[in-house]
């Protein structure tokens, strides 16, 4: 059975390559998406099936996975092995680390972040989802909407992911029952009404057998919507580049020790948002001084403009004392300068959050210490209600807290600017990353 599948796949692969070569790869737009859902909902199997059916894997990869499937005594290819790369993942049949995979169709390029479903690996899910435009939320048709489904969906909402595609998987195990599908859709819609996500779509699938993943399934004839791949190829994704708010956090000051560039002073960093041009007037934060951009250097060549995510060196027309952590903005569009930070926190530490502990904040290019002022409330994942009574925060809890930093930070709300609206908390005792935060 597996050998026949491989022969069919090779024939279709040649056709796909020919079709791809007749389309300009560079002109296709890019969609970043992440998987979400509970353990064993079939996330890795779905991604493997997508890669297989879209002819986006190499023959040696397919051969390796086929051999591994045979050794496990399977009569079919275990597609989850295409993404489960760690030894422990393959042995346990689970995802632990975030696995990134890349594939392309004639219409679009894709970057997939396959994230783990186990509750103790929720922090890995946050990492994978932090740059995504879309979230694929998988639900086991037998189990329905469970707590981890809700947790991942709420995190996707917090991270400002605007599109959620809910794949109700393993429909083959409920005999492709339309009533069961409708029950789960209703259950998820009732929960999702409290999320800040406008675009939520539902697709019944069987990742193992490929039903409604790339091709339509006769077994799901009652479903009149699009297949998963068609949805991914055609869903409208706005640009993830913020071109409105000009933000340039300085990483380092460049002073060459040479006679040729004796008077040169440049400020290196990455354009987080906005468009900077030679001659533009800029304001330096936190000092508030105004100056102009004299030149922009990209990879030792002068350019006339820079935009995200370019890493460049800016030379200013005035000699002003700047250092790492300062920020260049437009005079009429400034970031907020504050030491008091109010944010939603996803706690990722193994130990519970301790408001008396010392924490370090990482924000853009700044690294500052902070003290915790108060925990305002904790989110009940099942109801999304605010719990103001029990303020103990453990692993994977989501809470709203206030901190005060030892020096001012230049920030925006996360809903306005992902780069300047996100922070990381470091435990000074262990030097471990214990929380991710979205500034309100």
Task: Label every PLM stretch briefly.
Residues 40, 46, 65, 93, ...:
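Residue-level signature of catalytic and energy-coupling elements of molecular machines
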Residues 115, 119-120, 130-151, 161-165, ...:
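Conserved Switch II/interswitch segment of TRAFAC-class P-loop GTPases
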């Amino acid at each position: 059975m597996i050998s026949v599948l491989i022969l069919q796949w090779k024939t279709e692969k040649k056709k796909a390559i020919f079709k791809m070569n007749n389309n300009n790869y560079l002109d296709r737009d890019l969609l970043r998406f992440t998987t979400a859902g509970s353990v064993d909902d079939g996330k890795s199997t779905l991604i493997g099936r997508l890669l297989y059916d879209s002819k986006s894997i190499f023959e040696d990869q397919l051969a390796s996975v086929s051999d591994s499937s045979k050794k496990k005594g399977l009569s079919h290819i275990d597609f989850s092995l295409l993404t489960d790369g760690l030894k422990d993942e393959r042995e346990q049949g689970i995802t632990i680390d975030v696995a990134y995979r890349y594939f392309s169709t004639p219409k679009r390029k894709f970057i997939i972040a396959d994230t783990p479903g186990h509750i103790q690996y929720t922090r890995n899910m946050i990492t994978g989802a932090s740059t995504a435009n879309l979230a694929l939320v998988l639900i086991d048709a037998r189990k329905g909407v469970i707590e981890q489904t809700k947790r991942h969906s709420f995190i996707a909402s917090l991270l400002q992911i605007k599109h959620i595609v809910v794949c109700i998987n393993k429909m083959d195990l409920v005999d492709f029952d339309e009533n069961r599908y409708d029950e789960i859709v209703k259950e998820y819609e009732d929960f999702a009404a409290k999320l800040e996500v406008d675009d939520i779509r539902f697709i019944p699938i069987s990742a193992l057998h490929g039903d409604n993943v790339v091709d339509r399934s006769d077994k799901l004839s009652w479903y009149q919507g699009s297949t998963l791949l068609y949805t991914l190829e055609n869903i409208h994704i706005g640009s993830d580049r913020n071109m409105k708010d000009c933000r340039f956090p300085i990483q380092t000051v460049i002073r060459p020790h040479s006679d040729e560039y004796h008077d040169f002073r440049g400020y290196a960093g990455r354009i987080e948002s906005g468009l900077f041009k030679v001659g533009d007037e800029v304001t330096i934060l936190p000092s508030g001084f105004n100056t102009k951009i004299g030149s922009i250097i990209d990879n030792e060549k002068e350019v006339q403009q820079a935009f995200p995510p370019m890493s460049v060196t800016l030379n200013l027309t005035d000699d002003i004392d700047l250092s790492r952590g300062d920020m260049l903005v437009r005079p009429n569009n400034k970031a907020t300068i504050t030491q008091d930070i109010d944010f939603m926190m996803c706690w990722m530490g193994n130990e519970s959050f301790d408001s008396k502990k010392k924490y370090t904040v990482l924000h853009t290019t700044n690294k500052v210490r902070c003290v915790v002022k108060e925990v305002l409330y904790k989110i009940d994942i099942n109801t999304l209600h605010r719990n103001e009574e029990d303020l103990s925060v453990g692993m994977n809890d989501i809470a709203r807290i206030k901190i005060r930093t030892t020096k001012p930070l230049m920030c925006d709300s996360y809903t306005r600017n992902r780069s300047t609206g996100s922070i990381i908390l470091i435990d000074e005792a262990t030097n471990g990353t214990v929380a991710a935060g979205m500034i309100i």
